[in-house]
Amino acid sequence: SGGTESINAVHASVRSLWPESRELVITGTEHAAVLESAKRWRKQGGKVVRAPVHADGRVDLDALREIVRPGVTALVSIMWANNETGVLAPMREIVEIAHAAGALVHTDAVQAAGKVPVDVKSVPVDFLSLSGHKMHAPKGVGALYVSKRVRFEPFLIGGGQENERRSGTENITPSRPPRP
């Protein structure tokens, strides 16, 4: 889906642009797209650290403060709303912890968008993934918010579409059926 692609794009971009900061921080309760992308991060020589969660599924912020380290942690990638439990992550606090250490923040907001307030001005994440089918758009459509504060290396390169962030011809529905 578009959400899965955007998660992979963020992880690949950060891994490529900040190779000296080797660590990706996630939780064990992330969506499979994050967990599988983390496996790739590890295969490419990076380290993946799992932040613990409390019994109710909330991220342990005290442990996160100890895990996220300046010059070591490149990216903290934690979902805003859990797709299985509905637990909401304290994203504002996660952003504060990560940014204080110089790390970037990605959130999978697929389950949160449209259900709880998601505002990148009040919660200044660096990357935010969305999936259209959760908002009545066609399946496979997604969106990736990239803050103007950060660099981004495109996952797909080619024709430079989407302001050179995702190349490829857009899949559009014709306004009328093709003629025979």
Map each language-model feature to its residues.
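Pyridoxal 5′-phosphate
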Residues: 1-180
